Amino acid sequence: MLREVTISRAIIESYYRDLLNNLELDVAIVGAGPSGMVAAYYLAKGGAKVAIFEKKLSIGGGIWGGGMGFNKVVVQEEAREILDEFDIRYEEFEKGYYVADAIEVATTIASKTVKAGVKIFNMIEVEDLVVKDNRVSGIVINWTPVLMTGLHVDPLTVEAKYVIDSTGHGAQVAQFLLKRGLIERIPGEGAMWAEQGERLTVENTREVFPGLYVTGMAANAIAGAPRMGPIFGGMFLSGKKAAQEILEKLNL
């Protein structure tokens, strides 16, 4: 006989264990888009304890819709090895341009990331940062519906040696530092220029404040660099770069 209360208990107890197990992390990633998930995958493969916090119900960021709802994405030659790493199928459109199914990209990266040992917490929004001794040392979290409805509910905190802002165009995590005068400015992304946008996304992936990295479009927003549209190689390479640098700093 199926008992409703047993179903409830199974969900509550297993989620409770997951949350408790991820209150102290090597790396907390904010945003489960392409750069955030790729960073998490390589971090976990390298031995780091990592979790992703995504404010939306679904993960994947801007992958799903491809370009203008045509659910295909393009990846350039430099990032093709990451498609191979994730066993994502693709076809060559022209030399150096590879086309993949957006749904396969989103679901495969998510699945492989979770199977690498990453816990993804969806419907949890980061509303602030923990900053101690001039270093980011954790995130302040609350349920997305609580923040959406404006209810006065105090948050909880997660401790992390490093935090990655993978929130995309708004660089929402870095904004908390800007608001407190801990970084000088966030100019926002520039106009569309795919070639420069892709190159600079990787170049701008860095530690912008002790303990805080930026990846993907958040990296370009911090630097005022161009957007690039539905080409995702830069996102993937950005996530991998951040993971490699953090693993080195963690001595893993």
Swiss-Prot record:
Any one GO molecular function term: pentosyltransferase activity
Catalytic function, reaction form: hydrogen sulfide + glycine + NAD(+) = ADP-5-ethyl-4-methylthiazole-2-carboxylate + nicotinamide + 3 H2O + H(+)
EC number(s) recorded for this UniProt protein: 2.4.2.59
Cofactor dependency: Fe(2+)
Protein keywords: Iron, Metal-binding, NAD, Thiamine biosynthesis, Transferase
Binding site for NAD(+): 35, 54-55, 62, 126, 152-154, 217
Binding site residues for glycine: 227
Pathway info: Cofactor biosynthesis; thiamine diphosphate biosynthesis
Residues where Fe cation binds: 154, 169
GO biological process, one term: thiamine biosynthetic process
Role of this protein: Involved in the biosynthesis of the thiazole moiety of thiamine. Catalyzes the conversion of NAD and glycine to adenosine diphosphate 5-(2-hydroxyethyl)-4-methylthiazole-2-carboxylate (ADT), an adenylated thiazole intermediate, using free sulfide as a source of sulfur.
Entry similarity comment: Belongs to the THI4 family.
Name under which the protein is recorded: Thiamine thiazole synthase
Organism: Pyrococcus abyssi (strain GE5 / Orsay)
